[in-house]
């Protein structure tokens, strides 16, 4: 046995699962470490902009004139994640933070696999069950995407803290109190922390006894300390703590009133809805939280990960066949926490696709349980000890002859699991969004456009670059130039109006308002008859049009009259105030004359 109580065989298998998860997450190594370090996605580039300021300037900006130019924007991202990435750079230089930011999500992703294994052990105390759970989680597409090499975003960090809290909650006695510490760290890293804390709180009511629920409630007083950073967060966690403490009192009546907790949840839901509808200023944190979950913001429907009612997207992101296999376990496994957590995380994933990251955890464990039951029924012992040399089937077949487990049986089980995981492997492949054309364009802009004092976030620069908001953080971090809009969506309305403008005069009003000197366009913004893949539809929506009520031909006709068409397709040949400055294939840079 190993020091942690695992036999060597189980430890070896866990290491193999971790190595498999590690290999999948290193898939983009060559694209990340190119001529310089690049990151995966869009938001990581603004995190690194903040990290660079921390390391080189000694402060983290709370306001930035280099986005939403020329007005600037307050930075509402919470600081802990950026300080974690900045930590090695404070001692070794910014290069250390650049490398650390690349590998950090992979490290955290691997630790999440181990945590799922540990949580599964707390659920059933069965090594095989826990190993299969860890395997499923390691290949789950959404967990891979969130922890890819170079994905320097807070998502996998938040998932790790949630899993750590859940593991501590499943521990006996006062260890449950410690679950509030990861929640505090989450509250210092992400404004949506109360959403995941609420999932854990409601699920706890259906699993633990009165005393245990009370301890979990007290643990939620620890993240109330986050009110030092943000009052909204402090009030939210205080409300969750009160919810659990009152819930522990309600648990007393469960023997007399079977559905006491259900009634209690209904009352709390009505109270929450009333707070949302009441025109009371100090309840604004409730309204903003519910609005965030419901995705009522005008920009959210145009963001891929914030789309609603993407049921197939939720199922595929959570593991395809593993999601389907998780459903029977809802009726077989006697664990209220997992069942409720699965249902709640599925519901919020339907509201916004981004929340599927927390659905992966219950899917992995529930699917593992179903698979284990299937293996039991084909005489492969999972919940029975192999050393007993006897098949202990339920019902009338308890005295059946012993089943000899051979190596080929283990190989068959492994092949079966890999077969179930094939769709996950295929869906987990995620090439870096920044193409070679973009890399060349951004580096050319950095070297050839008028220099700006990029690290002086509080000082307004002379001009801005206008592109679609998807690419704002790239232009800001790599090219070191101010932008009209970035992934915060501030300024996106003016960018959309510019690209959809039907005349040069109309477009110039935006240019003058935003002090734009350069415009960057890219092929994927345009509309082509042979494909429906375009970002022009959300551009139209944000500009105030309704493409959902237009036929494809009408959209094409509309596009052919826009500034985006006149710039990217016609290369500004028929425009007076714009000229093509540089062409990088799919990416083009225009100068305002």
From Swiss-Prot:
Q: State the name under which the record lists this protein.
A: Dolichyl-phosphooligosaccharide-protein glycotransferase 2
Position of sequence motif DXD motif 1: 41-43
Organism from which the protein derives:
Archaeoglobus fulgidus (strain ATCC 49558 / DSM 4304 / JCM 9628 / NBRC 100126 / VC-16)
Q: Name one GO cellular component term.
A: plasma membrane
Q: In what way does this protein cross or attach to the membrane?
A: Multi-pass membrane protein
- Transmembrane parts of this sequence: 13-33, 99-119, 129-149, 155-175, 181-201, 230-250, 266-286, 311-331, 333-353, 355-375, 412-432
The residues exposed to the Cytoplasmic compartment are 1-12, 120-128, 176-180, 251-265, 332, 376-411
Record function comment: Oligosaccharyl transferase (OST) that catalyzes the initial transfer of a defined glycan (a GalNAc-linked heptasaccharide composed of 4 Hex, 3 dHex and a sulfate for A.fulgidus AglB-S) from the lipid carrier dolichol-monophosphate to an asparagine residue within an Asn-X-Ser/Thr consensus motif in nascent polypeptide chains, the first step in protein N-glycosylation.
Enzyme class, top EC level, equals transferase
Record site: Important for catalytic activity = 146
Entry keyword Transit peptide: no
**Cofactor(s) for this UniProt protein:** Mn(2+); Mg(2+); Zn(2+)
> GO biological process: what's one of them?
protein glycosylation
Biochemical pathway: Protein modification; protein glycosylation
> Where along the sequence does the record place the motif called DXD motif 2?
153-155
The UniProt entry annotates the motif WWDYG motif at 468-472
Annotated spans, Interacts with target acceptor peptide in protein substrate: 468-470
Q: Where in the cell is it found?
A: Cell membrane
> Which of the residues are on side Extracellular?
34-98, 150-154, 202-229, 287-310, 354, 433-593
- Keywords annotated in UniProt: Cell membrane, Glycosyltransferase, Magnesium, Manganese, Membrane, Metal-binding, Transferase, Transmembrane, Transmembrane helix
PANTHER family per UniProt: DOLICHYL-DIPHOSPHOOLIGOSACCHARIDE--PROTEIN GLYCOSYLTRANSFERASE SUBUNIT, DOLICHYL-DIPHOSPHOOLIGOSACCHARIDE--PROTEIN GLYCOSYLTRANSFERASE SUBUNIT STT3B
Which reactions is this enzyme annotated as catalysing? Answer: an archaeal dolichyl phosphooligosaccharide + [protein]-L-asparagine = an archaeal dolichyl phosphate + a glycoprotein with the oligosaccharide chain attached by N-beta-D-glycosyl linkage to a protein L-asparagine
Q: What is its EC number?
A: 2.4.99.21
Show which residues form the site (Interacts with target acceptor peptide in protein substrate): 43, 305, 535
